[in-house]
Amino acid sequence: MPKTTFEHVDEQADLAVRTYSTWPIWKYTIPYPSTVLMGSSGTPDLGIFLAVGSVWAQVITHFMPNGATILDVGCGCSKTARFLAPDPRIKSYLGLDPMRDCIDWSNRYVSPLTDGRFIFEHVDLHSDEYNPNGMIRAETYRFPVASDSVCIVIGASLFTHLLEPAARQYLNETGRVLKSEGHAVFSLHAQPANGLNFSGDEGRVDIDLDYFLSLADKAGLELQEDLGSMCGQETVVLVKKTGL
């Protein structure tokens, strides 16, 4: 009997099984990931998954130059990438995530449709919440790209899961890899507990926005635009400080 939901079988299932099974995988199209994979990217609901990815892609394309190089930190199972993939202005896209299943799925179903312009890399980051056996510490992690080489850094619901030492490092790395004319688009929960700049755990971190911007300033970044609440998270566009 065909499945009628997004629920799929055990964690050892083949990648093809980890894909929405009641629709065929049409040629030249990106299929939909299973509810398990979507859930690891923030929501198991297909409608919300697609809506959020579409919104983020529209914002990213607003800042996109021809020949764009994009770094998507915490790319999940291509929630945003699936909408960016057809854009011919993108020279290269690198998606990073500690969830290996998401990376494997994306390399199987997204990368081939981009002639290799889009690649996805697993990062074995330690996370008590998401990857407790990971070997790499987020607070010392270095993005695997050259300095001054990236046009756009995407952090969709990234800082919502980073504790302060990791958040500082990721901002520093953004300042390192971003081109002088580049943009970083980040979202965060901005309602920390009273009197705190940071509160919560890796499941949900809240950061005072002014404090976040002060950390960005120390990393050589400054606010270009506050987009306000986007998909339920405060979203900002950062650029390199003039002269850096």
Question: Where are the regions a protein language model picked out?
Answer:
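A short glycine-rich, Lys/Arg-flanked "PGG" loop and its adjoining helix->strand segment in the class I
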Residues: 168-180
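Conserved S-adenosyl-L-methionine
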Residues: 74
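Conserved acidic residues
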Residues: 68, 151
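A conserved beta-strand element that flanks and buttresses the S-adenosyl-L-methionine
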Residues: 154
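Short catalytic micro-motifs in class I SAM-dependent methyltransferases
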Residues: 157-158
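Class I (Rossmann-like) S-adenosyl-L-methionine-dependent methyltransferase catalytic domain
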Residues: 1-67, 77-142, 164-169, 183-244
